[in-house]
Amino acid sequence: MTDLSKHTPMMQQYLKIKGEHPNEMVFYRMGDFYELFYDDAKKAAELLDITLTARGQSGGNPIPMAGVPFHSAEGYIARMVRAGQSIAICEQIGDPATSKGPVERKVVRIVTPGTLSDEAFLEDRRDNLLAAIYHHKEQFGFASLDISSGRFAVSELESLEALQGELQRLRPAEILISEDFPYTDILEGFTGVRRQGPWLFESDTALRVITQQLQVRDLTGFGCEDLTLAVCAAGCLLQYAKETQRTALPHIRKLTRERREDAVILDAASRRNLEIDTNLMGGQQHTLAWVMDRTATAMGARELRRWLNRPLRDVERVRQRQQAVSALLDGFHYEPVHDLLKRVGDIERILARVALRSARPRDLARLRDAFHALPELQEALKPVNSHHVVKLATVIGEYPELADLLERAIIDNPPVVIRDGGVIAEGFDEELDELRNISENAGQYLLDVETRERERTGISTLKVGYNRVHGYYIEISRAQSDQAPVDYIRRQTLKNAERFITPELKEFEDKALSAKSRALAREKGLYDDVLETVAEQLAPLQDAAQALAELDVLSNFAERATSLRFTAPEFTDQPGFDVEEGRHPVVEQLLDEPFVPNNLLMDTKRRMLVITGPNMGGKSTYMRQAALIALLAYTGSFVPANRAVLGPVDRIFTRMGSSDDIAGGRSTFMVEMTETANILHNATEHSLVLMDEVGRGTSTFDGLSLAWATAEHLAKNIRCYTLFATHYFELTQLADDLEHAVNVHLTATEHDDSIVFLHNVHDGPASQSYGLQVAKLAGVPQDVIRNAKTQLAHLEGLEAGSTPSPAPVSVNEPKPAAPTATKAASVEAVYQGDMFAMAEPSVVEQALEKLDLDGITPRDALNQLYELKGLLAK
């Protein structure tokens, strides 16, 4: 591929362009197709399931080729990008009619997973983010950009754990890292990871690029002047965005500094376990967002997900949102607001496309409809008694001039693209109307001229015609040609006729022959002018879009509060949680029968709840429900409870579920311990910690020891608010040993050898775990269940026969039994005894203890040995 002389001029052109874009798949425009060659063609054929063919030869071998029609290329490109590929769009920019050699082509745009703005490529209810990471030791600068809206944010993160949390929160579509970035294991699962040269992260260059983009002298006004690492990341990101878009980015006007301490922090494991907007299978069903999202607009849905993923710690801001929700609830004001917002649509992304000059006719039609809805929306907001809503209404404003412009300029139902015209409305531009009239009505015009000239001249053989060589003409038979008026100019003499032209017909000819192309050019020019006029007000329009998205979330919260019977939580400076009749917001929607609500009380005297109870009794649901109520409250939403009073929360941790990390080479137990270690290192007294089945992934004694020590550390050293679910009933002793720990349990009852889960939470420890009954429900064969019951009876008998100790020893509720010594030996390996108790010495041990080894004779020693052997046999 390097010796260009062996290739045709067209392939030489392609190879030169491909050499400039080695990391992108080049979509090379050839007439009505985009063609791909060599490895790009092979990859496209595999990913898109299209035919792989060949064109010409290279080194004696056919050149692989694949292609897609240009008019349907968007769908193919979208599939490639979703697979993590980057696409270089190479268009014909020269005129084939005038080109000598290959038509001039150039790459006009690079489409990458993180720089999408076209509606066809984007998921409408989720952000599509480009991110960049710059590191120094274990400190990280992080930047993110949504090019489809202009949101640009930076932060500095103090640990790898914090970086993982941000990646899990934002889920960027594309991530830029330096060539020497060493922590690639945390990027497992992200498809669009791109390594960039270290010079692209250089601090002076980065600062210059950012200040030029934002049109400022420094970053003091954005609070980012001291964020060296974040600025390096942001500079690389911005350069990459400009390179891919090949145009200015005027919609990127602000830089937001995100501070972790401003939000309730959730680490990566907690986000996964709580299923905020992605379930454990990677889908979106049965998540918190799935329940909470009834927003009217896609931009509102995206804002909602930002709120759910980043609850606020600033209680005043939370109360401001909550008060706005209450005001929208009063008199059901949210209902007309919701209906009007549906007419507004996703103007946030439309405005970004306006800024990038890639907005399509239907974008402008939707923008027109949105502007028409704003006056009615302002009327609907007037009775809402909320200072915050008033502020939002002021920012939203009205745009009558733009509404009028778009009403006059764009037809009601425009085509998808401007390419073929038919977008600008009749009456908007006199010249365009005339050109269209000429182009569309040329035939009728010529008939009218023919009729008029026959009447004027009285020549019956007169007719008007056209040919490609001579254009338009008036033809008169040879017999009547001498009657031609003086204003007729002879154009052509035929055997039986003369052809003439008139000044009027010549003028029409000049217009008609170029009318269609001139009309299209005129229409495109007018369309660009309309885009430019809208873009002139980009800044206030973007602010209005943000305010509309926030209003959408608030009205959505009001609707959810009504439909789901949520109540407004109260906030206090005093630590703790007091929830009456709390419910799990997602599980409640999935049940056919009513959800069983439960109370939650945690205060300075109840910092740890040790939760026991049957398998499937609802322990995990109860714990997650507590976390989701706290999360919803700190977003400004109402919560699923009759009453809720919440103290300060700085972080929410969860150690729940079990799965190994095959890619990372970590066992289930290693994953569990890693998550536990993270909690023990980072939790504070204001953290809410959910611990489910700690220690179950290893041997009984190891697991119990770790669970006990972990619970003690959380309760005594950190003093955080902990829900600690366990099947180690020994841990119920913690309530007696620790000042702030209490036992609670989930109830169940047995009926006709089956189990009924009551799902009620009561104080005190559970009596048993009903493991065999749950196994029966799961379909474990009956002979296995019977054998398990036999083994359980023996184990419980061993436990009942052991020496009592001050620490609890029961695994299940004791049932007296007396197994034989031989049977005891056979089950010794699985007996879950008391790790803190000393067993009573056996008869053999007592006899050995009495022996005087220094005074015994060899014969007596031998006799004693026989006696001991006899005792052991008994």
Swiss-Prot record:
Protein residues bound to ATP: G613, P614, N615, M616, G617, G618, K619, S620
GO biological-process terms attached to the record: mismatch repair
Region (Disordered): 799-820
Superkingdom of the organism of origin: Bacteria
Family: Belongs to the DNA mismatch repair MutS family.
Protein's job: This protein is involved in the repair of mismatches in DNA. It is possible that it carries out the mismatch recognition step. This protein has a weak ATPase activity.
A GO cellular-component term linked to this record: cytosol
Range of residues in the leader sequence: none
Key words, A-Z: ATP-binding, DNA damage, DNA repair, DNA-binding, Nucleotide-binding
Annotated organism of origin: Marinobacter nauticus (strain ATCC 700491 / DSM 11845 / VT8) (Marinobacter aquaeolei)
PANTHER family given in the database record: DNA MISMATCH REPAIR PROTEIN MSH1, MITOCHONDRIAL, DNA MISMATCH REPAIR PROTEIN MUTS FAMILY MEMBER
UniProt protein name: DNA mismatch repair protein MutS
Keyword DNA-binding: yes
InterPro entries per UniProt: DNA_mismatch_repair_MutS, DNA_mismatch_repair_MutS-lik_N, DNA_mismatch_repair_MutS/MSH, DNA_mismatch_repair_MutS_C, DNA_mismatch_repair_MutS_clamp, DNA_mismatch_repair_MutS_core, DNA_mismatch_repair_MutS_N, DNA_mismatch_repair_MutS_sf
One matching Pfam family: MutS_V
